[in-house]
Amino acid sequence: MNTIPDSIETAAASGDLTAALAATVAHFGCQAGTIHLLRDGVLKLAAHKNIPPPVVQIIGTVPIGKGIAGLAAERREPVTICNLQTDTSGQVRPGAKATGMEGSLAVPMLADGELRGVLGIAKAEAYDWPEAETALVLAIAARLAPL
C-alpha cells in the first residue's frame, strides 16, 4: 500500500497544487517538477517548481502524445527517463532537456479512470526510478487528480 506522506496530503487537502508539487519534489529528493492539467484536449501547465522561465513558456501547453508529459497522458502510464540529457529514445523534447535535469518521471493524474493531468518530477542526476517510488508517485497523482 502506498501511503501518501503527510506534507503532500496536507497540501492536497488544501487544494494547493503548487504546495503539493513542492512537497512531492522535496519528498523524492528531486530538484524540479510540473503539474499539467488537461484543458480543452491539451495539457496546460498549472504548477511548476524550479523550471527556468524560458522553459515555462515552452511547456505551457503540451499536446497529448508529445514529450514526456504528453506521452504519460496518452499512454495513461508512467514514463521514466534515466537521463534527459543523453536520452536517444525520441521521447525527450528540447524543453525537457533545457531544464538541465536528468532523472525524470511523469505519471498520469487519473480520477475514476479519467485523465485529469500529468505530474512530473525530476532529479539533477541520472536516476532509474524504482517500482515502489513510481507506484507512490502514481498514488500522489491520483490524490491530486480531482483538484
Locate each region found by the language model.
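Helix-loop-beta substructure at the N-terminus of cytosolic sensory domains
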Residues: 9-46, 56-58, 66
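Signal-transmission linkers at sensory-effector interfaces
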Residues: 1-15, 147
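Regulatory loop-to-helix N-cap segments in sensory/regulatory domains
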Residues: 122-140
